[in-house]
Amino acid sequence: MLNIFSLICICINSALHSSSFFFAKLPEAYAFFNPIVDVMPVIPVLFFLLALVWQAAVSFR
Protein backbone atom coordinates (compact mmCIF):
# COMPACT_ATOMS: atom_id res chain seq x y z
CA MET A 1 0.00 0.00 0.00
CA LEU A 2 2.86 2.34 0.80
CA ASN A 3 4.39 1.76 -2.64
CA ILE A 4 1.14 2.72 -4.39
CA PHE A 5 0.88 5.86 -2.26
CA SER A 6 4.49 6.74 -3.06
CA LEU A 7 3.84 6.26 -6.77
CA ILE A 8 0.80 8.53 -6.61
CA CYS A 9 2.81 11.20 -4.79
CA ILE A 10 5.64 10.98 -7.34
CA CYS A 11 3.19 11.29 -10.25
CA ILE A 12 1.42 14.27 -8.69
CA ASN A 13 4.72 15.89 -7.75
CA SER A 14 6.15 15.53 -11.25
CA ALA A 15 2.93 16.85 -12.78
CA LEU A 16 2.98 19.90 -10.51
CA HIS A 17 6.62 20.67 -11.19
CA SER A 18 6.30 20.23 -14.92
CA SER A 19 3.20 22.44 -15.06
CA SER A 20 5.41 25.46 -14.39
CA PHE A 21 6.99 24.88 -17.79
CA PHE A 22 3.68 25.52 -19.57
CA PHE A 23 4.49 29.23 -19.46
CA ALA A 24 7.85 28.78 -21.17
CA LYS A 25 8.00 29.01 -24.93
CA LEU A 26 10.04 26.69 -27.08
CA PRO A 27 12.56 28.22 -29.46
CA GLU A 28 11.20 28.80 -32.95
CA ALA A 29 13.28 25.94 -34.40
CA TYR A 30 11.47 23.49 -32.10
CA ALA A 31 7.97 24.91 -32.47
CA PHE A 32 6.71 21.75 -34.18
CA PHE A 33 7.29 19.89 -30.88
CA ASN A 34 4.65 22.01 -29.09
CA PRO A 35 1.85 19.37 -29.26
CA ILE A 36 4.19 16.69 -27.91
CA VAL A 37 5.42 18.92 -25.08
CA ASP A 38 1.83 19.72 -24.10
CA VAL A 39 1.05 16.00 -23.65
CA MET A 40 4.26 15.02 -21.84
CA PRO A 41 3.13 15.87 -18.25
CA VAL A 42 0.20 13.45 -18.63
CA ILE A 43 2.42 10.45 -19.41
CA PRO A 44 3.10 9.46 -15.74
CA VAL A 45 -0.65 9.46 -15.07
CA LEU A 46 -1.18 7.15 -18.05
CA PHE A 47 1.40 4.72 -16.67
CA PHE A 48 -0.37 4.76 -13.31
CA LEU A 49 -3.71 4.03 -14.98
CA LEU A 50 -2.11 1.22 -16.98
CA ALA A 51 -0.78 -0.32 -13.76
CA LEU A 52 -4.20 0.01 -12.14
CA VAL A 53 -5.96 -1.70 -15.05
CA TRP A 54 -3.31 -4.41 -15.11
CA GLN A 55 -3.75 -5.10 -11.40
CA ALA A 56 -7.52 -5.15 -11.80
CA ALA A 57 -7.12 -7.71 -14.59
CA VAL A 58 -5.16 -10.03 -12.29
CA SER A 59 -7.51 -9.36 -9.34
CA PHE A 60 -4.96 -7.28 -7.36
CA ARG A 61 -2.74 -10.24 -6.52
UniProtKB/Swiss-Prot annotation:
Keyword Zinc-finger recorded: no
Propeptide intervals in chain numbering: 1-24
One of the GO biological process terms: photosynthesis
Keyword Transmembrane helix: yes
Database matches in InterPro entries: PSII_PsbK, PSII_PsbK_sf
Keywords for this protein: Chloroplast, Membrane, Photosynthesis, Photosystem II, Plastid, Reaction center, Thylakoid, Transmembrane, Transmembrane helix
Primary location group: plastid
Membrane topology: Single-pass membrane protein
Highest taxon, organism lineage: Eukaryota
Transmembrane portions of the chain: 40-60
Gene Ontology cellular component list: chloroplast thylakoid membrane; photosystem II reaction center
Cell location: Plastid, Chloroplast thylakoid membrane
Pfam families named in the record: PsbK
Coiled coil spans: none
Function: One of the components of the core complex of photosystem II (PSII). PSII is a light-driven water:plastoquinone oxidoreductase that uses light energy to abstract electrons from H(2)O, generating O(2) and a proton gradient subsequently used for ATP formation. It consists of a core antenna complex that captures photons, and an electron transfer chain that converts photonic excitation into a charge separation.
Subunit structure: PSII is composed of 1 copy each of membrane proteins PsbA, PsbB, PsbC, PsbD, PsbE, PsbF, PsbH, PsbI, PsbJ, PsbK, PsbL, PsbM, PsbT, PsbX, PsbY, PsbZ, Psb30/Ycf12, at least 3 peripheral proteins of the oxygen-evolving complex and a large number of cofactors. It forms dimeric complexes.
Entries under HAMAP family matching the protein: PSII_PsbK
Entry protein name: Photosystem II reaction center protein K
Organism from which the protein derives: Liriodendron tulipifera (Tuliptree)
